[in-house]
Amino acid sequence: MVAEEARKEAMAKSVSGGKITYFVVASCVMAAMGGVIFGYDIGVSGGVMSMGPFLKRFFPKVYKLQEEDRRRRGNSNNHYCLFNSQLLTSFTSSLYVSGLIATLLASSVTRSWGRKPSIFLGGVSFLAGAALGGSAQNVAMLIIARLLLGVGVGFANQSVPLYLSEMAPAKYRGAISNGFQLCIGIGFLSANVINYETQNIKHGWRISLATAAIPASILTLGSLFLPETPNSIIQTTGDVHKTELMLRRVRGTNDVQDELTDLVEASSGSDTDSNAFLKLLQRKYRPELVMALVIPFFQQVTGINVVAFYAPVLYRTVGFGESGSLMSTLVTGIVGTSSTLLSMLVVDRIGRKTLFLIGGLQMLVSQVTIGVIVMVADVHDGVIKEGYGYAVVVLVCVYVAGFGWSWGPLGWLVPSEIFPLEIRSVAQSVTVAVSFVFTFAVAQSAPPMLCKFRAGIFFFYGGWLVVMTVAVQLFLPETKNVPIEKVVGLWEKHWFWRRMTSKRDIQETTILSH
């Protein structure tokens, strides 16, 4: 008994304190390029929608309204409704329809053949979409390109977070997994830089859309050389010897027997067949299922994609011109990327729940204050004075910083680490699918909501920030420094979830915390 307890304690220290090897860093940097393609797409779509030549070619009605508004500056009936076009909204949100379908298909690929094939398929699909988008001649080609991009994003978003969380030692899992959100920020920032530089070029929008092929090519080619994760090897092949060799290479030590034992035990109940989705519905996985649904939902109703998609549009609404709005969006991108980098440095020290709390309160204050400014402007014929316009930019930066070190990276990190191996792939697919559903809903609803409710849209998302901040503090256990195959035991010790989860066939660990 004493010997067994000593083994568990030694294992916990070994796994949680594992060092970061160059092999792990190189593999994770390459895999995280999946985040760059996602971030680039978010940034580029919002930017090209503020480019006159792009609107004139594909969305002439929107362009005409925009020109009329320029001639009649101060007409409060136009400012908030300029981009309320179903066709334009379809361009933005079509990606998430195909992404939803793709991520469900990616679950089977990731579960049966490994994380690496899904990453490769994501890169190939995104590359095809970038090529078609850059050469689009009509709206149909443009939307087909978006659908292909969606397939790429669906495969990448399903597989990359799993890859990062499984490759990382527990002690550094938060930092490494947050690299996915950092790469989303880098992609978003890169798109804003390119949009700003190409705005005055006749066909600059083509350059912006086609440049997405660069990160897609890197991801596609790089995935050919990626190693598979030890967790995936044991799940897909059952080859214990091969898994042990990869563990030694990943951890940089030959002392991996305890972690290998945990992987073998975790894989014993792993499904690689069509029953995986049904298994997720079992009562013992109720906490994981709930989190797979609510975390991506909460991430979207922070309102971040309203800012990401429509930041240039929002800045034009509050009084900036095309160039000024793109520059303001560029500044926002720099702030978001920097805050995510900060999150990587502190997430494994102060924990997930603390960052959720700080970021949630920060975003709440920003949303409400922006809403008040827009509401005051509405009283004065919808004209926002220049000083207030700059205040909106500052508040958006504060908001984006809050998201960048909380719901941005943690919305991907936490789901990727809380699922046991036997349902990890399918649960991650559910998480990404829910994210796509509500991203689509936000993209569809934001323009008409901004048009109809104006300031009310900011209070709407502010209300959700209150709900999610309280919910996370009450119902999410802290996973800081807990080995990934031991996280499952946290639910049995949680004040709420322990009442509805059956005892699980896992070994207890001495470092479980709440």
Swiss-Prot record:
Its main location: membrane. GO terms for molecular function: monosaccharide transmembrane transporter activity; symporter activity. It comes from the Eukaryota. Keywords: Membrane, Sugar transport, Symport, Transmembrane, Transmembrane helix, Transport. Residues 1-19, 477-514 are cytoplasmic. The chain crosses the membrane at residues 20-40, 87-107, 124-144, 147-167, 174-194, 207-227, 289-309, 327-347, 356-376, 392-412, 430-450, 456-476. Coiled coil: none annotated. It is found in: Membrane. It is a multi-pass membrane protein. It holds the Pfam family Sugar_tr. InterPro entries: MFS_dom, MFS_STP/MST-like_plant, MFS_sugar_transport-like, MFS_trans_sf, STP/PLT_plant, Sugar/inositol_transpt, Sugar_transporter_CS. Gene3D superfamilies: MFS general substrate transporter like domains. The keyword Cell wall biogenesis/degradation does not apply. Mediates an active uptake of hexoses, probably by sugar/hydrogen symport. Belongs to the major facilitator superfamily. Sugar transporter (TC 2.A.1.1) family. This is Sugar transport protein 3. It comes from Arabidopsis thaliana (Mouse-ear cress).
